[in-house]
């Protein structure tokens, strides 16, 4: 069953493109707003002294964390593609990713020190990996094969990315550096929340129902194996952290 919009005058309501493009345009615009807004002040938050509202890292450590953070964000897209194709479908995967990103920014908006920082990094890395590759894939899914609007549609979509990336550092940076870091992170969280709200509402109206389902779903037996292996991996990771804590070697310098 093909639920993609036809190229009729009814769907030419967003710069001559399928109406679903507006939903994805603003979803990715707000996601990039939240991400680049957060990044604009994160390194300052890490190396500013505690008396200035920061965490007191030395500048080299802060720069290393930022580099590792950026690398992990792009590596996590492999996981996002797999879960979309085999487990949740692209539409659900994007929404789950957005929720994780929002809670990642919320974690930073709370003055809870280094623990909140690393919880935030984990949530945003996972969330971005789920959202970013799949929202782009959904843009392509708006068009039937041979639809001449596809290229211009992607151009409009990328424009939304650029708008979010351009505006965020000024707004979040101004709020975070002029007033309070946690207020800046709160604005990033609000941006992702706005993206989720319009994605939820617009998705029901304008996005294909096919995107709710995985394109190559796991068989029941494979799903059970995936859950078991993921659980074993998570338990092993936690045990390693506990062992490092008992040995007194669980500190930032062992990771950057």
Show where each model-derived region lies:
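Short amphipathic helix-loop junctions that connect adjacent transmembrane helices
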Residues: 40-63, 248, 253-254
């Amino acid at each position: 069953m093909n639920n993609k919009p036809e190229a009729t005058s009814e769907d030419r309501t967003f710069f001559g493109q399928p109406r679903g493009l507006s939903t994805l345009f603003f979803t990715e615009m707000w996601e990039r707003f939240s991400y680049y807004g957060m990044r604009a002040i994160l390194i300052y938050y890490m190396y500013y002294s505690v008396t200035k509202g920061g965490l007191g890292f030395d500048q080299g450590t802060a720069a290393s964390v930022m580099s590792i953070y950026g690398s992990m964000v792009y590596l996590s897209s492999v996981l996002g593609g797999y879960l979309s194709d085999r487990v949740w479908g692209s539409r659900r995967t994007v929404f789950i990713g957005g929720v994780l990103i929002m809670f990642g920014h919320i974690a930073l908006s709370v003055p809870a020190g280094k623990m909140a920082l690393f919880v935030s990094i984990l949530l945003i890395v996972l969330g971005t990996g789920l959202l970013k590759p799949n929202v782009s894939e959904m843009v392509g899914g708006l068009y039937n094969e041979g639809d001449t609007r596809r290229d211009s549609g992607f151009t409009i979509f990328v424009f939304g990315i650029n708008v979010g990336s351009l505006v965020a550092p000024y707004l979040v940076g101004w709020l975070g550096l002029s007033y309070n870091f946690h207020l800046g992170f709160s604005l990033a969280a609000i941006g992702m929340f706005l993206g989720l709200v319009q994605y939820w509402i617009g998705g029901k109206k304008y996005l294909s129902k096919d995107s709710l389902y995985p394109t190559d779903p796991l068989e029941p037996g494979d799903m059970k194996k995936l859950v078991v292996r993921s659980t074993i991996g998570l338990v092993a990771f936690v045990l390693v952290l506990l062992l490092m804590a008992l040995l007194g070697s669980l500190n930032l310098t062992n990771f950057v």
